Regions:
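Active-site-proximal beta-strand/loop segments in catalytic clefts of secreted hydrolases
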Residues: 17-20, 46-49, 87-91, 119-122
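Long, well-ordered, tryptophan-enriched scaffold segments
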Residues: 79-89, 96, 104-173
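Mature extracellular/periplasmic domains of secretome proteins
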Residues: 4-5, 31-38, 72-83, 100-108
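Active-site environment of divalent metal-dependent phosphoester hydrolases
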Residues: 52, 93-94
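Acidic, glycine/polar-enriched metal-coordinating patches/loops
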Residues: 66
Length: 175
């Protein structure tokens, strides 16, 4: 899990939500193909943003925009009523199966109740292949090529588990 998320027991249907971005200015929305069907689902979300290495990308060339930020992706999933977020490294990661530090997306100060998790790319590769017949790399490449979301429900797949995050409040003096 990541510290930014909440605690709890969950058993949720799974959906692939691409990069987890809703960007009206760029006319791009990973959640549009899912519509209301994303409510109460666990969404698999790639890190970064489409066309990350393309200097002509609508997402500010090869410079990251606000849409690449983990906290923005989590907020967007919440706005679409997702039940959990599961991050996976994108194709450009130097270590595709490396996991982020527990506090990478923040310490949970926002009070989100939904779990925020991460899994290795190899796990997502297997899930996507079995659920769709395609590969996560092929879906990413199609998004990058066409700037069209490839989001879809992963029929028959569920995310089950329990996350317990204990938060401790500490009093400190302001010097």
């Amino acid at each position: 899990p990541l510290a930014v998320g909440g605690s709890g027991v969950f058993d949720l249907p799974l959906a692939f939500a691409g990069y987890g971005i809703t960007a009206p200015k760029q006319e791009y929305d990973d959640y549009e193909p899912l519509g209301k069907r994303v409510a109460s689902k666990a969404v698999l979300v790639l890190r970064q943003e489409p066309q990350k290495d393309n200097p002509h990308s609508v997402f500010n060339g090869n410079q990251a925009t606000q849409h690449a930020a983990l906290v923005r992706k989590i907020a967007n999933a919440s706005e679409h009523e997702a039940g959990a977020v599961v991050f996976c490294n994108d194709a450009s990661a130097t270590e595709p199966d490396a996991l982020m530090d527990f506090r990478r997306a923040g310490g949970g100060e926002n009070g989100r109740s939904m779990p925020v998790l991460q899994v290795s790319r190899s796990v997502v590769t297997d899930v996507i292949k079995q659920a769709t017949g395609s590969s996560v790399a092929a879906l990413e490449a199609e998004i990058d090529r066409t700037l069209e979301p490839q989001s879809q429900l992963l029929d028959g797949w569920r995310l089950r588990g329990e996350v317990t995050i204990q938060r401790q409040q500490t009093d400190a003096e302001n010097i």
